[in-house]
Amino acid sequence: RYCPRNPEACYNYCLRTGRPGGYCGGRSRITCFCFR
């Protein structure tokens, strides 16, 4: 729901889940991926 328009929100969402961050990726960058 954050991507592809708001990669910063995706990043912050991942931070809140305890991950070190995240990015928009996949087809057309529509998926928010969290770093492990």
Curated annotation (Swiss-Prot):
Main subcellular localisation: secreted
Protein name per the record: Tddefensin
Gene Ontology terms: cellular component: extracellular region
Function field: Antibacterial peptide mostly active against Gram-positive bacteria.
InterPro entries listed in its UniProt record: Defensin_invertebrate/fungal, Scorpion_toxin-like_sf
Record flagged with keyword Electron transport: no
Keywords: Antibiotic, Antimicrobial, Defensin, Disulfide bond, Secreted
Homology family: Belongs to the invertebrate defensin family.
Source domain of life: Eukaryota
Record-annotated disulphide pairs: 3-24, 10-32, 14-34
Location relative to the cell: Secreted
UniProt record, GO biological process: defense response to bacterium
Tissue specificity remark: Expressed by the venom gland.
